[in-house]
Each structure stands twice: as structure tokens, then as C-alpha cells.
Amino acid sequence: MTDSITAPAPAPTATISSRSITPISTQGNSHDVEKTAPSIPHDDDDDDRTAHEYPTTTEKGQNSDPSKEQDEAGPPVSEDDNLTFPEGGRGWYCVLGGFLCTFISFGYANSAGIFVEYYQNELLQGQSSSNLAWIASFQYFLLFFCGSLTGRIFDTGYYRPMFAAGIFLFLLGQCMLSLSTQYYQIFLTQGIILGISYGCIFQVGVTVPQQWFHRRRASAMGIVAAGSSTGGIVFPVMIKNLIPMIGFGWTMRVIALIAAFCLSLAFVCLKTRLPPSIDVHTPQGWRAVKWFDFSVFRQAEYSFFVLGSALAMLGLYSPFSFCDVWTTTHNIPANGYWLAVLNAASMFGRILPGFLADRVGRTNTLFPHLLAAGILMLVFPLTNNLTGMIFFSILYGFASGSYVSLIPASIGQLGPTSTIGTRLGMAFAGSSLGGLVGTPIAGAILGPDNTNWWGMSVFSGVMVIGGAMNSHEMKP
């Protein structure tokens, strides 16, 4: 009994916790390794890659200096995004695939101005600018609105069948458009069928690359979004020059062949990295799917941002739809090529702000660009000569370009990457209302004789400035 009382207690076992280890920062690598994160199950053959094949970005450790952490890591990561991001590697193939998706979908939709001019002067003479604007507006509306459904499909893991359906609908719509001669036929084929195909293609193109990047996400999305500007350069010039040579029908078929090649290549390049966030292999899983998940709007920052995006959409694309009408009515030289100039400037406005956004914050970059676009829109009627049109096209194209690249990247930082499809989809659905009515309202204000340019400019400019103010409510 005495021995049991007086016997010395055993020495405590030394324990080592992850908190007792000082983070190690490597000076020679731009990606600091400060904490080991669990590996992520992949859906492709990249599972056996070693950590040395490409750098990774992880969540910062708890012992990090908060101020230094914000400076080095850029935008904050959502709390349940404790993931490792490759920041490259196969992700660059996904960026290429996303570029091709936006080239065919948003890029072709950005060619609306050349179609409005051709329909008004040739194929659909007598139709007003407002009536013709409904064709383009329905394309933008469905491109974004379909995201509310396609985003949920993406999160269930069925992005490839959805993408294949988008390819089929695009080729079907384009071939049927080549045979159309009446307004209702063009509205159904170009406005409805092509619009739905854009929604399937665009959603996959802007969502998959975000699973591969966090620190470089805005830069990667800038490259992806540049595809829409590239399409806005190529397609108007192609259409303007091919129609006099081979006719409207064969021009549409040539575009269908180009799209078939580009989208097939994108289909090969795009691969998701994370497992589906919704398990639909059981009846309970399917019942759990909410095709319209309005719960995301409980987050105030998200709701403000979507509202700002919708307001900006009401006026942002008015110059893209009516610039050729403006240059025709004011006898400005190089008519038919100004849409290409706008999109060329927009391409730089989508890439360069993306690199800046990764350093100073995404909304910190988006706000001044949208504000500048709104101010430029207010003075659009002053560009009634060649010099003015050159300056406006370059400045407005660059300022408005950040919208397409930074909107998805900004939404991506508001929640976990595993549900990014749903959050992007619901945001696009909210923005779609602006895309649906914005251009027709601008066309109605413009009037049947295309004379009220000041009214159209004030409406569009005020909407874009309002969108900029709402987007600024979100943290950088």
C-alpha cells in the first residue's frame, strides 16, 4: 500500500501537435508551403501525380500573421474550402477548354450588332431595332438563366452529358438558322435554341477551371473570359465578309463547322477535379437536389453582388448591339468593324484586370472598371466622328471587359468550391433578367427612327453605374 503511494508517477509522454510546429516559408517559391492539407480525390488520371509536378496553394495556418496572410494569399478563402489547389498543371488545359467554350457561346452572342444591321437592311427589312433586339436579348437571357439549372447539374457530376447536349443544340440551331428567312424562324433558332445551348456550354466553361485555381483564379478566369472577346472579334468580321461571297445560309453552316471543332476540343480538355457535391446515385440523393436553390440568397454579400450584376447587364451591352447602327446613321467610316474593335479592347479588359485582381482584390478591381464603363456610356452620343468612335471603342471595350472575367471569380470566393456550380448558376439566373429586357428597352428608347441616342445612353449608363455601386458592397 505504501509502495503504491510513494512510487513516482510515470514521466509524461512528450507529444507533438501541428500547432507547435513553426510554419516554414520557402523564399524561392512563390507558393509558400505552410500547412499540409489532405489530398483531394480526383476523377481522372491525375491521382498519381506527385506534389513536385506543379505547385499547390493551401489554406494558411492558424499561427500565420493575418496581415501578411492577406497580402500574400489575396482574396479570403471560404472556411470550408480547406483544399489543395494545383494552381496549374492540367488546370491550364481546362483553361484552354473554357476559352473555347466562351469563344463559341458568349463570343458568338457578342456578334449581335452585325446581325441587327444585316437583318434591318437585308433579311428582315422593316423590323424595328427594338424587335430585332429581342433576338439578342433572349440569347443573353438564356445564356445566364439556364445556369440556374445547369449549375445544379454540374454539382451532381453530370457535366459531360450537359456539355454534349449543348454542343448538339448549338449545331442544330445554327443549321436551322441557315434555312430561316422569317422573323419568327430566326427568333426560335437564334434566340431560343442557340440561347439554351449557350447556357449549357458557358456554364461548364467557366466552372471547371475554378476547381484548379485559387490564388490565380482571377487570372485564369480572365484568360477563359477572353474567349468571348476573341469570338466577338472573329465572328463579326467573318460574317461581314462571307455573306457577300457565299450567302447567309452557307455562312451560318461554316460557323457551325468551326464550332464543332472548337467544342470537340473543349470536351477533351475539360475535366473536373473534385468529386460531386451531391450524390445522386440513390433515390434519396435525387430527392435532395434543389434545382432552384434560393438559400444562397440568404448571404447578404451574395445578394447585393447578384443585384449589381443584374443592374449592370441592363445597360452594359447596348453599344455591342447598336454600335453598327450608330456608325451607319452617322456615316462614320469602317462601318461593320467597330464591333470587332470593341471586342478586341474587351479582350485586354478581361485578361489584364484578372492579374491585377489576384493582387488587390476582385471587387476592388471590378468596381472602378464598371464605374468607368457607365460614365463612358453617358457620353456615347458625343462620339459622332471617327476620332471619337476610336477612343470610345477602345476605352469602353476595355472597361466593360472585366465584367465577364471578374463576376465568376468574385462569386467563387463567396462559398465552397464544391458548390460553385449552384452559386454561379443562381447568380447567372439573377443577371439574366437584365440581359432579357436591357437591350429591348434601349432599342425602344432609341425609337423606330434611331434618333433618341441621348435617352438610350443615359438609361444604359445609369444602370451600369448602379451595378458598380452594388458590387462595391461586397468585400474585396
Write out the residue ranges for each language-model feature.
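Intrinsically disordered, low-complexity terminal tails of fungal membrane proteins
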Residues: 1-88, 272, 280-288, 476
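Hydrophobic core of transmembrane alpha-helices in multi-pass small-molecule transporters
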Residues: 99, 103-104, 173-174, 183-200, ...
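Extracytoplasmic gate region of multi-pass secondary transporters
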Residues: 104, 108-119, 297-364, 408, ...
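Intracellular juxtamembrane helix-capping segments at the cytosolic ends
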Residues: 119, 191, 198-213, 220-221, ...
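Interfacial helix-cap and linker-helix signal at transmembrane-aqueous boundaries
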Residues: 119-120, 153-154, 234-247, 327-328, ...
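Conserved MFS/SLC helix-loop-helix module at the cytosolic interface between two early adjacent transmembrane helices
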Residues: 145-185, 357
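Helix-loop-helix hairpin linking two adjacent transmembrane segments in secondary transporters
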Residues: 215-216, 223-274
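C-terminal transmembrane helical hairpin of 12-TM major facilitator-type secondary transporters
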Residues: 330, 336, 340-346, 350-414, ...
